[in-house]
Amino acid sequence: MADDEFEPTIENIINSEKLKWIFVGGKGGVGKTTTSCSVAIQLSKVKESVLLISTDPAHNLSDAFGQKFTKSPTLVEGFTNLFAMEIDPTPDQLAPEFMETQSDGFNLQEFTAAIPGIDEAMSFAEVMKLVKSLEFSVVVFDTAPTGHTLRLLSIPSLLDKGINKFLSMQQNFSGIFNAVSGMMGGNAPSLENMEGKIQSTKKVIEEINIQFKNPDLTTFIPVCIPEFLSVYETERLIQQLTKLDIDVHNVIVNQIVYPEKDCSLCNARQKMQKKYLDQIADLYFDFHVTKLPLLKAEVRGVPSLKLFSELLIKPYDPSTPLVLPNQEN
């Protein structure tokens, strides 16, 4: 095995000609948004068009770039091919046309309430319909904390179960609905209409599911910090991703403290972190592990993000500390 086969950068992702979907995720507070912004910035250098999507209800993209984003792709200031959007994968935000079925006499909201999670599945399908129609070269997802992300990635199987339950309901109650429809002059609930909408949603999800499980098209980048809970959750996340057949070959370790003269607290924390860095090295010896430093200022604004993003492709050298434009001496 060559020494540089698992180089400590994300060059393998940046240089991939086929990757379409890139997920960035991990425990809350580890720097997922900063990392996803940095990944998108590096991709914008080599791709025709890049879309960065936040599925985290906290929506930190606007804060990171210092620019307001909405649920429609917006060009990031300072770029010509990088777009960003912030979405909430909930039925209230993403699937109004599904809820309009109520005007035909069918209250879909009540129906989806009977099948836990299917409303989220339909909403996610609507997001993917939109994203696919826009035809960006690559899409980067800034995801919510681990549990929420795994739910989204598990949606295809959830939707299959929901549709099977719906079809069973249709078979069992079609006679009742038809009778009600006759009494109301044909304005009662249309199960056929409902089935068409769900089947359309299922088709999109199935197509996306195939792509998500294709390592040439999709990869996941876990972000962690060298502390017990973060390392533990990262390992659990990677195990779950493996069960879902989703590729993961990169790990980003953020907020690393390096030794400093006359800083006993820094040195004590660095010593504590070393134990977990050693664990990460043992666990992910066959991964691209990128190490990022804890900085003295927040990484906010395009100039700082551009500078920080370089650390994803050029390993950090603590002998030449990174100084951000907004950093005070």
Swiss-Prot record:
One of its GO terms (biological process) is tail-anchored membrane protein insertion into ER membrane. It is an enzyme of class 3 (hydrolase). One of its GO terms (cellular component) is phagocytic vesicle. SUPFAM superfamilies: P-loop containing nucleoside triphosphate hydrolases. ATP binds at residues 27-34, 227, 254. It is found in: Cytoplasm; Endoplasmic reticulum. CDD domains: ArsA. This is ATPase ASNA1 homolog. It comes from Dictyostelium discoideum. The gene is arsA.
